[in-house]
């Protein structure tokens, strides 16, 4: 599977075209809208979320509630475009209109794509950069991820994300009895945190940052249960599943770090405390005593839950902006201010779920793939039976 996205933050709409989804997958707009609504929630979001109520339109590739095997086109309207029609319109402006145009950006924000992107593409108005580099684009990445989640769910694979740290406040209680319990608890939390006490402290940290005109980041974790053993590859570097997952997490706006399993903690432990001992029983086949590897060894799945974490830096747009330079005058100025969130970590956990789900669904279709969901399901069932008795 593959997809591309198009659209600007304040343009008329966001679009994604998805190729390679098997035929026979049950899919309706509500499957996608549910994920879009989850992305819009979360403590610390800005005023934009009060304007937009993201709803997807399925333009192609689905008929009567089932995928056809042809490309799927999804569109999400930007309601805020009504206030930006002249500024973000596709038609050329007159010389006078260009002089009168508001919201031209010439003061780049430290930590954002503004300056680097303007230099790369030769834009004197950095709005041309920030409109596309905005995290608004993750709306349609979540839409594509919702399709991938649907593929996984049909194959008995569950995906859930949660927040384990915001602004230096760490969740101490992160245990759960089932992935359904994890989902239930996090969906009820304003910051998508399993630890209620830590969640309350995270809310206070977000409030403090907002009142100071600042922003804060954090860490999200995605857990996936039900993946078969041996998905991915050790044969080539670019087919290793952990490498693909790491790239997917790092592709999310403002993410600066990733780890799988115990991750960087492995540097502090001897091998005897890191590697997961192998067990076998007749009912389950091969399992592990622990899951320090996070469900991945040698670029392939082990059959244990996949555990991936990502670090999100504080959002670069600050209401008490940092020092910058006006690219027209070269004079020092404080950076431009755009409407923004004080913390988007809870929402980012939903985006992280989406990109992880996409990579896993793609890997499954590549390995067991045919053009029909029923045949893929049969192939995976045969593989699981083979692996249990290996």
UniProtKB/Swiss-Prot annotation:
The EC number on file is 4.2.3.5
Instruction: Please indicate if the UniProt record lists Magnesium as a keyword.
Output: no
Q: Which InterPro entries match?
A: Chorismate_synth, Chorismate_synth_AroC_sf, Chorismate_synthase_CS
The Swiss-Prot or TrEMBL record lists the needed cofactor(s) as: FMNH2
Please list the GO terms describing molecular function: chorismate synthase activity; FMN binding
Which residues hold FMN? 132-134, 253-254, 298, 313-317, 339
Q: In which pathway does it act?
A: Metabolic intermediate biosynthesis; chorismate biosynthesis; chorismate from D-erythrose 4-phosphate and phosphoenolpyruvate: step 7/7
Reactions accelerated catalytically: 5-O-(1-carboxyvinyl)-3-phosphoshikimate = chorismate + phosphate
Q: Which UniProt keywords apply?
A: Amino-acid biosynthesis, Aromatic amino acid biosynthesis, FAD, Flavoprotein, FMN, Lyase, NADP
Q: Which residues form the signal peptide?
A: none
GO CC annotation, single: cytosol
Gene3D superfamilies the UniProt entry points to: Chorismate synthase AroC
HAMAP family named in the record:
Chorismate_synth
- Role: This reaction introduces a second double bond into the aromatic ring system.
Please state what the protein is called.
Chorismate synthase 1
Tell me the lineage of the source organism: Bacteria, Bacillati, Bacillota, Bacilli, Bacillales
Protein's gene: aroC1
């Amino acid at each position: 599977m593959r997809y591309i996205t198009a659209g600007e933050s304040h343009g008329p709409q966001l679009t994604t075209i998805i190729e390679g989804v098997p035929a026979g997958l049950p899919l309706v707009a509500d499957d996608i809208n549910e994920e879009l609504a989850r992305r819009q929630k979360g403590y610390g979001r800005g005023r934009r979320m009060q304007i937009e109520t993201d709803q997807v339109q399925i333009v192609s590739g689905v008929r009567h509630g089932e995928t056809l095997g042809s490309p799927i086109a999804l569109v999400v309207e930007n309601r805020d475009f009504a206030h930006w029609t002249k500024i973000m319109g596709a038609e050329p402006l007159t010389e006078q209109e260009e002089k009168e145009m508001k919201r031209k950006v010439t003061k780049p924000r430290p930590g954002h794509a503004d300056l680097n992107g303007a230099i790369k593409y030769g834009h004197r108005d950095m709005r041309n950069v920030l409109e596309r580099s905005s995290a608004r684009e993750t709306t349609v990445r979540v839409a594509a991820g919702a399709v991938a989640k649907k593929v996984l769910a049909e194959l008995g694979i569950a995906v859930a994300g949660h927040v384990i740290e915001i602004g230096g406040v760490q969740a101490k209680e992160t245990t759960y009895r089932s992935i359904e319990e994890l989902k239930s608890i996090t969906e009820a939390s304003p910051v998508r945190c399993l630890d209620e006490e830590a969640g309350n402290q995270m809310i206070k940290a977000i409030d403090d940052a907002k009142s100071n005109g600042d922003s804060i980041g954090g860490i999200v974790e995605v857990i996936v249960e039900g993946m078969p053993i041996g998905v991915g590859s050790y044969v080539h570097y670019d087919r290793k599943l952990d490498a693909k997952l790491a790239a997917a997490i790092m592709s999310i706006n403002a993410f600066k770090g990733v780890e799988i399993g115990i991750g960087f903690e492995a540097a502090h432990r001897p091998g005897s405390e890191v590697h997961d001992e192998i067990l076998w029983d007749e009912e389950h086949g091969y399992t592990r005593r622990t899951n320090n590897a996070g469900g991945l060894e040698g670029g392939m799945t082990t059959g244990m839950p996949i555990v991936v974490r990502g670090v999100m830096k504080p959002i670069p747009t600050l209401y008490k902006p940092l020092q910058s330079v006006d690219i027209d005058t070269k004079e020092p100025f404080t950076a431009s201010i755009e409407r923004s969130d004080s913390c988007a970590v809870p929402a980012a956990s939903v985006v992280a779920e989406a990109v992880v789900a996409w990579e896993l669904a793609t890997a499954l279709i590549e390995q067991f793939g045919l053009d029909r969901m029923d045949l893929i399901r049969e192939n995976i069932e045969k593989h699981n039976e083979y692996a249990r008795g290996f």
